[in-house]
UniProtKB/Swiss-Prot annotation:
Listed name of the protein: D-aminoacyl-tRNA deacylase
Job of this protein: An aminoacyl-tRNA editing enzyme that deacylates mischarged D-aminoacyl-tRNAs. Also deacylates mischarged glycyl-tRNA(Ala), protecting cells against glycine mischarging by AlaRS. Acts via tRNA-based rather than protein-based catalysis; rejects L-amino acids rather than detecting D-amino acids in the active site. By recycling D-aminoacyl-tRNA to D-amino acids and free tRNA molecules, this enzyme counteracts the toxicity associated with the formation of D-aminoacyl-tRNA entities in vivo and helps enforce protein L-homochirality.
Extent of motif Gly-cisPro motif, important for rejection of L-amino acids: 142-143
Enzyme class: hydrolase
GO-annotated cellular components: cytoplasm
MF (Gene Ontology): D-tyrosyl-tRNA(Tyr) deacylase activity; Gly-tRNA(Ala) deacylase activity; Ser(Gly)-tRNA(Ala) hydrolase activity; tRNA binding
Lineage: Bacteria, Pseudomonadati, Pseudomonadota, Betaproteobacteria, Burkholderiales
Catalytic activity entry: glycyl-tRNA(Ala) + H2O = tRNA(Ala) + glycine + H(+); a D-aminoacyl-tRNA + H2O = a tRNA + a D-alpha-amino acid + H(+)
Amino acid sequence: MIGLIQRVSQAAVRVDGRVVGEIGPGLLALVCAERGDTVAEADRLLEKLLNYRVFSDAQGKMNLPVRNIDGNGLAGGLLVVSQFTLAADTKSGTRPSFTPAAAPEAGRRLYEHFVARARQQHPIVATGEFGAMMQVSLVNDGPVTFWLQVAPQAVRAGEAETAKSA
């Protein structure tokens, strides 16, 4: 599962001209399920995202997670937006292939699981609408942008086996 996270001072998502989700300071998370992903990958990505230290502490170092953006326990917002294009294969030609992305029904199920778990674990969660054409606006704070990826279990197992035989 892939997450492209951006530290924002504010962000909003609109569908058909209406705001469906918005946050103040926090993280905009564009998320994508890949073929082979399960709820285990969704849970690992969420845990990583919620604990990833991208907010500045009193010394100006990126040392604080979205759960505590001011160092005093203030949680930042989390705006979760589905974006299957993150799984694009761009290695050849001039047209991306989306074969690596999960099928739409699997992607929806994993996105909804991710959002439900986020709402259980974090106090401020807003979302876009899965499968909708959305307009996302944001003020990127920094800019600070990170690509987080949790490979499907089968891929991780294959990498471990390759490392053993090397």
